[in-house]
Amino acid sequence: MIRISLADVDLNVCDSGQGHPILLLYGFPTSHLLWRGVMPALEDAGFRSIAPDLAGFGESDAPERLDIGMANQARWMFALLDELRLDERPVIAAHDIGSAVAQLMVARNPERIRGLILIDGVYADNWAIGEVESIRAWDPAAASRLLKLLGRRVRAWSDSPASQEGLREMLAVDEAEGAALRIIRAAQSMDPRSTVEILEQLRRDHPPTLVLWGESDRFLPVESVGKPLAALFGAELKVLPGGHFLPLDCPRGVAAAIESFARSLPPEL
């Protein structure tokens, strides 16, 4: 892990491997650890994996005064890429609300992105926002109880033992109260209007795109979210065995799809 200081935030970043860069953006309420089963396979395949914790999420810091909504997250991700001084444009693979960040990055500066992979991502105002409403309203004074509650709810989020184990591990941090406060703040930062406003822009101008989906995703179903999202980008939709937390359920399948897609892109000039 490395710590990268930007103008107004400090990011916790897992950066491993050599080769074509893949920027990995996770979804709520996980962290860079969502990609722990994917990154070794990408490294073995000759790729560089860059998995940051979003600002104010996970172990990345952001002052309380700052808006940590997805538009600012997109700005910080570009600043991170600038700081890393990459030799070529990255492919972005993004899950859940990480896909909102990726879509905003495309809308802001599509020429800086070589390719886009959206994994069980958000589409327009379909953010499964109902699942986080109770977290938004949680009393910060009782934050220390939140992670215990979420730990008991992981079975409702996924039938997969792999997802349940991974989610419990990500929620079982040493400083429970601080972690819970970050989760509450993250939930409060979610605003589906940010992706509704850029739909037509994305339809007109975007890099080559692949959409990956878990066949049993109960939060963002493939029929109502995955297919419209793929249609927006004119992208192939590939369905893999697993649920919403596909990188935990099917890490080898996700890594193989990322590798195949990245190798299919035209070479950088």
Q: What function would you assign to each model-found segment?
A:
Residues 107, 114-145:
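Flexible "cap/lid" loop of the alpha/beta hydrolase fold
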Residues 14-59:
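Conserved HGGG/HGGXW glycine-rich cap/lid loop of the alpha/beta-hydrolase fold
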Residues 94, 98, 102:
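Gly/Ala-rich beta-loop-alpha elbow adjacent to hydrolase catalytic centers
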Residues 127-128, 147-204:
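Conserved alpha/beta-hydrolase catalytic His-Asp/Glu region
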Residues 51-93, 256:
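Active-site loop/oxyanion-hole signature of alpha/beta-hydrolase fold enzymes
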Residues 233-269:
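Catalytic active-site module of serine/aspartate enzymes centered on a nucleophile-bearing elbow/loop
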